[in-house]
Regions:
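A transmembrane-helix-recognition feature enriched in membrane-embedded lipid enzymes
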Residues: 163-183
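A structural signal for short, hydrophobic/glycine-enriched beta-strand patches
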Residues: 18-167
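N-terminal type II signal-anchor transmembrane helix
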Residues: 1-27
Length: 183
């Protein structure tokens, strides 16, 4: 009886909370961080946006997930982005772009690799760039694995992923992140 009550009340509440986190995420705009992290994705402008943020002075370092599963135009674009380092900002600052292979080709693997590199480099604060539906799950993973302040933002030009697809995919991932922490 108690289990049935927990399921009847708990599942819808959990589902609504996860749906809210996916569809209406908290997006951050910090003035300055030690590094910007770009988690993988091919259908939006997250790489261009991360570089733009760095050029505006938000950070001097960009860490970019370069999954081994990338193919075709996506892989070529990431390769080109990764070889463009260092970049000189308009104000003369040097911006370093460091690409890394995720520990596992998942958001969890990107998180563990990026936070390990951040610790090794002495970064104390991070801004993670992803797409709108991924913001809350990325925040959860990075907050599980990184000791310092973590900010997460989406791109100004959103991906064409449908809200329905994002809700289904990211809600499942969000629940997985809640049940099985990355770190």
């Amino acid at each position: 009886m108690v289990l049935a009550l927990v399921l009847v009340v708990g599942l819808p509440v959990t589902g609504l909370t996860a749906a809210r986190a996916v569809l209406f995420p908290q997006v951050d705009s910090p003035e300055r961080v030690d590094a910007i992290v770009v988690v993988a994705g091919s259908n939006d402008d997250r790489y261009v946006y991360a570089r733009s943020l760095a050029e505006e002075g938000v950070a001097d370092h960009i860490l970019v997930s370069q999954p081994p599963s990338g193919t075709g135009r996506y892989a070529a674009a990431i390769d080109s982005y990764c070889t463009s380092t260092p970049v000189t900002a308009r104000d003369g600052r040097r911006i370093d772009i460091e690409c890394f292979a995720p520990d596992v080709d998942t958001t969890e693997g990107e998180t563990t690799a990026a936070t390990r590199i951040a610790h090794e480099r002495g970064y104390r604060s991070l801004l993670v760039v992803t797409y709108w539906g991924h913001v809350s799950r990325v925040r959860m993973y990075f907050e599980q694995c990184f000791d310092g302040p973590v900010y997460v933002t989406d791109t100004p030009r959103p991906t064409s992923i449908s809200r329905r697809y994002a809700l289904l995919h990211e809600t499942g991932g969000y629940l997985k992140a809640f049940i099985r922490p990355a770190c």
